[in-house]
Amino acid sequence: MIFDTEEFKKRGKEDFESAWHAGPSVLTPPTTDLMYPRLTYLRAQAHPVFETIHRLREAYLAIGFQEAENPIIVDEQEVYRQFGPEAMAVLDRVFYLGGLPRPNVGIGKEQIQKINSILGRDLSEDEEESLRKTLHAYKKSEIDGDELAYELSGVLHTDDARIVEILDRVFPEFRALKPESSRQTLRSHMTSGWFQTLGAIWEKVPHPIRLFSIDRCFRREQAEDSHRLMSYHSASCVVAGEYVTIEDGKAVARALLSAFGYTDFEFRPDDKRSKYYMPDTQTEVYAAHPDHGWVEVATFGIYSPVALAEYGVGIPVMNLGLGVERMAMIMNKAKDVRELCFPQFFPIRYTDTELAAGVSLLAEPATTPGKNLVRSLINTAVTHSTAIGPCSFVAFEGEIAGKQIRVYVEEPEENAKLLGPACMNEIFVHKGAILGVPDTEKFAEVRKNGISTGISYLFAAASQAAAEIEQAAHFGIPTTVQIKMARLPGDINLKIEPWVMRYITDNNLKTDVRGPVFLTIRSEVLPTSEV
């Protein structure tokens, strides 16, 4: 809360020790949602693949490579130019782009009659002619598919819903359409774009040329598995110049991967021999990391002059590439690339701390006096916890909601303690389970290794009582709050977020907050004469 600085300055000069001890009085008691572990300051989590892309971009830029964007749609002819006789085997793994053909729609008497029936009127001669012209323009691709309904609604002077009905019932040709493949493919590897890019610029820019690109590639795998996806990201670069050799690949690999903590490197001949590389230049890069050990992280090679000649490129070119998803798997110690990339489709895993943040209270006071009442109730209850009933203790006397209120913690039953055995239980999350446990040897493991929610049964019950007393005070009436046997979270004013309950259910975990609370709190409104 905002406090009076002049008052504290004065009090500090008069009695420093007293003023210092009064410091906590300026703090507004927090609601449960503003208490740790519910109160958090979290950095939003980046997706591991895009976090890796970001780091790779920064690493490439730091070692002097300029960023480029290569064509993502590649004509199959480019694959023949790059791979030569090997092209057919490569094309077996690419995705061809296809589309729906434009139907040749005929309009005869039968079609006109059906349209008239749907519209509830006869088409005029001008409307018939305009309809034919519009469908013909669509056939010639002068009108886009997503604009056809709009154009027809203008021609036939009706709304889009009627047009959709006409297309469905009168022109079955649209429903019978089947996709037809083109000769265009989706890029299966970044190399298919580098040849085109280098062919366009190699004679127009200074050498050596150093470019990188990080983007999607698409490969028609037989099936996706824990290490392969049909759509993945490639982090690729080229160095082109008169004096480029295989040594450039080694130097670039070291410079790039050192940014990720790799220290030692080995370069091994790759058994795979892509025809767009020179013989004996395709090389696998293995690197050592303090956490990951030796792992294969990249491949490089020198482009074949046969392939370069197809694009008129007359200088040696070194190409290095690595799979972003593979790098992300290594960095995150992931076992399944599908789960790494698409965690939303896999079971969610929460830590005990994250689950504890989803446990709070159903009801609590809204005002500062009401929040202070909670403290008073707890202090009074703890102080007299072993008192035997019938007994009653004043916990609070003061103003709430403009009314003078007196509040008691009491036990009306004979030979019963003021607090039930479970009142001092505290809510912990341990191995995914939500448990209400006492401070005993039996539950030492839970209290030591679990995560406390910061909520005890007494705190939860006192908060509920304070909220109800606060509400009753607004109406100027007394109230009594009794918490008896707890069987469910709601019995002790406990709120568990739906996502937490779903996690507990999905993983066959448990919520156990059972226990005898037996706490009675009563308020009364004081007459003006007693104030």
Swiss-Prot record:
Substrate binds at H189, M190, T191, S234, A235, S236, Y276, Y277, N319. SUPFAM superfamilies: Class II aaRS and biotin synthetases. GO terms for molecular function: ATP binding; phosphoserine-tRNA(Cys) ligase activity; tRNA binding. Keywords: Aminoacyl-tRNA synthetase, ATP-binding, Ligase, Nucleotide-binding, Protein biosynthesis. The keyword RNA-binding does not apply. GO terms for biological process: translation; tRNA aminoacylation. It is an enzyme of class 6 (ligase). InterPro entries: aa-tRNA-synth_II, aa-tRNA-synth_II/BPL/LPL, O-Pseryl-tRNA(Cys)_ligase, Phenylalanyl-tRNA_Synthase, SepRS_C. Belongs to the class-II aminoacyl-tRNA synthetase family. O-phosphoseryl-tRNA(Cys) synthetase subfamily. Catalyzes the attachment of O-phosphoserine (Sep) to tRNA(Cys). Homotetramer. Interacts with SepCysS. This is O-phosphoserine--tRNA(Cys) ligase. It comes from Methanospirillum hungatei JF-1 (strain ATCC 27890 / DSM 864 / NBRC 100397 / JF-1). The lineage of its organism: Archaea, Methanobacteriati, Methanobacteriota, Stenosarchaea group, Methanomicrobia. The gene is sepS.
